[in-house]
Amino acid sequence: MESSSSLLHHSYLSYLNPKFGKRPLVSYPLMQSSRKCKQTRICSNKMYVPGFGEASPEAKAAKHLHDFFTYVAVRIVSAQLESYNPEAYMELREFLDTNSVSDGDKFCATLMRRSSRHMNLALRILEVRSAYCKNDFEWDNMKRLAFKNVDDSNTRLMREYVLETSHVETDSDK
């Protein structure tokens, strides 16, 4: 049968027995490791996501958003150039024909190294990307839309499955 002292934390035992507090904590490795484990489970109310290795899902989403902000910045700069600097607009269009924006940093680094004119375009894209991310992107709206899209998609898929498997007549079948 377990003694009551193994069920109590060492700080409580040192209050009850002054000699107990002088013992090294190393003599209770099982109690310490199980306590840490329980704390982790109790404190975390989020889902465990296995298999992402190098990055969390949030980090991967942030990377995709980062690349998307580059794409948006290129669109904004392109639209601005089209109206007031057609020559620079054509240079950017030609560069876009041969270089993908799927990796935003690689795109900007390549653009910077092309020529001094391209360097100015790249700096403008970096400036617009930062300003759009910090000032104009509607983060709350994105969160709301993401929740709505997931809920709507789940509902639609479940409805389709139920209709396929239940052989229920719908109004269109009559």
Curated annotation (Swiss-Prot):
It is found in: Plastid, Chloroplast. One of its GO terms (biological process) is response to water deprivation. It comes from the Eukaryota. Residues 1-45 form a transit peptide. GO terms for molecular function: protein folding chaperone. The keyword DNA-binding does not apply. InterPro entries: Chaperonin_RbcX_sf, Chaperonin_RcbX. GO terms for cellular component: chloroplast thylakoid. Pfam families: RbcX. Homodimer. Interacts with rbcL, atpB and THI1. Chaperone involved in RuBisCO assembly process. This is Chaperonin-like RBCX protein 1, chloroplastic. It comes from Arabidopsis thaliana (Mouse-ear cress). The gene is RBCX1.
